Curated annotation (Swiss-Prot):
Protein encoded by which gene: Tgif2
Purpose: Transcriptional repressor, which probably repress transcription by binding directly the 5'-CTGTCAA-3' DNA sequence or by interacting with TGF-beta activated SMAD proteins. Probably represses transcription via the recruitment of histone deacetylase proteins.
Protein's name in the database: Homeobox protein TGIF2
Source species: Mus musculus (Mouse)
Posttranslational mods: The C-terminal part is phosphorylated in response to EGF signaling by the Ras/MAPK pathway.
GO BP, one annotated term: negative regulation of transcription by RNA polymerase II
DNA-binding region: 16-79
Region (Repressive function): 103-237
């Protein structure tokens, strides 16, 4: 082995040592982070304020704390849960969404177990929530045990009186409801007759005007009437 090979090996070892030393955090800082992780092992996601507080206690940057928690949730947290007698694979640690989300939800739990607020039925639609699943034509049951929403029959939903009431409400609530209050359209045949009569009157008027104009051009101009002046004799003077 030559001296150059030895130099390269020493350089690699020195780089490896620097990398290892760069990744190691102070023991006091690690202890503070581990204590916080154990206290919040069911929801190990510190908030921004808690990250700043831990940064001041451990003299570490916020980025270092975030990276430490990412690795700790994969390596340290499963052992902590096993010591409590719980299987980490059956738990999904949820992010903190508020004070009510400090408890982890089991992975096998169904979202239908959560309380869902159902809005009050409106006057437009009527929905009935039933706990019994709907059956298909072949009698097969749906796989999902979610509560089914069944619409009422069309006869119960839409009646002539209810339709008129809905139209009246929609017309009264619309800001442009007055624009649609137009008289009913006339039948097409009546429109056609009126248009034909009007067109005939226009044609007659035009023809009459042309005849009068032609008659004026053909008639000669009337002669001018000259009244003779009275003759006065000289003897009368």
């Amino acid at each position: 082995m030559s001296d150059s090979d030895l130099g390269e090996d020493e350089g690699l070892l020195s780089l490896t040592g620097k990398r290892k030393r760069r990744g190691n955090l102070p023991k006091e800082s690690v202890k503070i982070l581990r204590d916080w992780l154990y206290l919040h092992r069911y929801n190990a996601y510190p908030s921004e304020q808690e990250k700043l507080s831990l940064s001041g206690q451990t003299n570490l940057s916020v980025l270092q704390i975030c990276n430490w928690f990412i690795n700790a949730r994969r390596r340290l947290l499963p052992d902590m849960l096993r010591k409590d007698g719980k299987d980490p694979n059956q738990f999904t640690i949820s992010r903190r969404g508020g004070k009510a989300s400090d408890v982890a939800l089991p992975r096998g739990s169904s979202p239908s177990l959560l309380a869902v607020s159902v809005p009050a039925p409106t006057n437009m639609l009527s929905l009935s929530v039933c706990s019994m699943p709907l059956h298909s034509g072949q009698g097969e049951k749906p796989a999902a045990p979610f509560p089914q929403v069944e619409l009422e029959s069309p006869k119960a939903l839409v009646t002539p009186a209810s339709t008129l009431t809905l139209l009246t409400r929609a017309e009264a609530g619309s800001p442009t409801g007055g624009l649609f209050n137009t008289p009913p359209p006339t039948p097409p045949e009546q429109d056609k007759d009126d248009f034909s009569s009007f067109q005939l009157l226009v044609e007659v008027a035009l023809q009459r005007a042309a005849e009068m104009e032609l008659q004026k051009q053909q008639e000669p101009a009337p002669p001018l009437l000259h009244t003779p002046l009275p003759f006065v004799s000289e003897n009368a003077k």
